[in-house]
Amino acid sequence: RTALQSGIDKLADAVGLTLGPRGRNVVLDEFGSPKVVNEGVTIARAIELPDPMENAGAALIREVASKTNDSAGDGTTTASVLAREIIKLGLLSVTSGANPVSIKRGIDKTVQGLIEELEKKARPVKGRDDIKAVASISAGNDELIGTMIADAIDKVGPDGVLSIESSSSFETTVEVEEGMEIDRGYISPQFVTNPEKLICEFENARVLVTDQKITAIKDIIPLLEKTTQLRAPLLIIAEDVTGEALATLVVNKMRGILNVAAIKAPGFGERRKALLQDIAILTGAEFQASDLGLLVENTSVEQLGIARKVTITKDSTTLIADAASKDELQARIAQLKRELAETDSVYDSEKLAERIAKLSGGVAVIKVGAATETELEDRKLRIEDAKNATFAAIEEGIVPGGGAALVHLSTVVPAINGEDKDADERLGADILQKALVAPASLIAQNAGIEGEVVVEKVKAREWEIGYNAMTDKYENLVEAGVIDPAKVTRCALQN
């Protein structure tokens, strides 16, 4: 047990150093150049202890950090510090003869009660300032990142997706990509309309959406004739266009008779159908599905969609369309949100979130720039944290930061467990009550102040008041912009 405990301590100490505005950075000496990191889960994942028992202890904290990171994407340091305290106090009690199962039950009951309390106390995010505050705190008090994330969310809305990429310059910028991007480019480079940029651009194009292969030109001749009469370009999205059909399209395109381009359907298997359906709804097309017996040769112009602007490069296609029916689009987004709520797989939930964003018309790309590779890594991690924290806050509201929410929750513990008769369960509740003040105490210690004094002072104040380590004052943290997403605090507790 001692070895387990010492492993837990070693890891939690390294992670705990980064907590709070005055937290230090940790330098990880991995292969290649050392990395400077200020982010719990990365540190936890990087540390392996030589002693197998100690490493088993460290693995417990690593697990806690990873779980919190998966569910809330931030708050990993807080969760690790909590876990360490609970384990430390728990081992003490068990050593002195308490029943570990009852203690665990006591802790679980209390956590349940505290989470209900947290939900009551959390207040929804109001406007841009809150978003900026949450993002800044999470990125390690970086106002710049806070402003950026607030900008990005202004542009794409709460359903949008923020993706984070490395930029080749020193600047960090936010770009908003309108419309829906498909990761498939033109089937043949002959379709290019702008030879300088090697892209194909259409305006007000008709769109054919199908999951069939098009090989015979006679299947699409009626459509080609109609769209040529309408003087509208035609974009074909099909499983593949090959053989005679492709050859004919290319020849006629080069002679300037037809204005047409073809791309392969994105995704594969079940996901391909779903994505094609999304495109169809966005452009107002009828999805010509082979399993419904809708053949391409019978397609009429009315069944084609319309895209206001189409840009096709060699490996991606962007469609900007004004959805024909807003209701259908909203219904589709709602359906995807339900699926997102029900799925367990991380891969699926990422893909679903991406589809929701593409349909609701917003993908903001934050291009992260920095002077060195090391700085870039650190900045990307911080922005990633800030992004996750912001979406968590939009989802479940905010609570005062700086560990204050947990300190205030610790004062509610006796009320939750008033009627518990079992001594060991009560012990569990006490352990949790003592552990809850650890994050606030550590934030103060990292700022060079006596932790216990801070905790006692915070306990005596109202819910929103806490210790601000940046200004070294006790103040209303919500007004001072020191706020955490309730979801992050909740996940830290649960794990």
From Swiss-Prot:
UniProt-recorded Gene Ontology molecular function terms: ATP binding; ATP-dependent protein folding chaperone
Family matches, as PANTHER family: 60 KDA HEAT SHOCK PROTEIN, MITOCHONDRIAL
Chaperone found in the keyword field: yes
Protein name: RuBisCO large subunit-binding protein subunit alpha
Organism (species): Ricinus communis (Castor bean)
Alphabetical list of SUPFAM superfamilies matching this protein: GroEL apical domain-like (SSF52029), GroEL equatorial domain-like (SSF48592), GroEL-intermediate domain like (SSF54849)
Other noteworthy facts: This protein shows ATPase activity.
Keywords: ATP-binding, Chaperone, Chloroplast, Nucleotide-binding, Plastid
Subunit structure: Oligomer of probably six alpha and six beta subunits.
Cellular compartment(s): Plastid, Chloroplast
InterPro entries in the record: Chaperonin_Cpn60_CS (IPR018370), Cpn60/GroEL (IPR001844), Cpn60/GroEL/TCP-1 (IPR002423), GroEL-like_apical_dom_sf (IPR027409), GROEL-like_equatorial_sf (IPR027413), TCP-1-like_intermed_sf (IPR027410)
Principal location class: plastid
GO cellular component terms given for this protein: chloroplast
Gene Ontology biological-process annotations: protein refolding
Protein role: This protein binds RuBisCO small and large subunits and is implicated in the assembly of the enzyme oligomer.
UniProt keyword Repeat present: no
Protein family membership: Belongs to the chaperonin (HSP60) family.
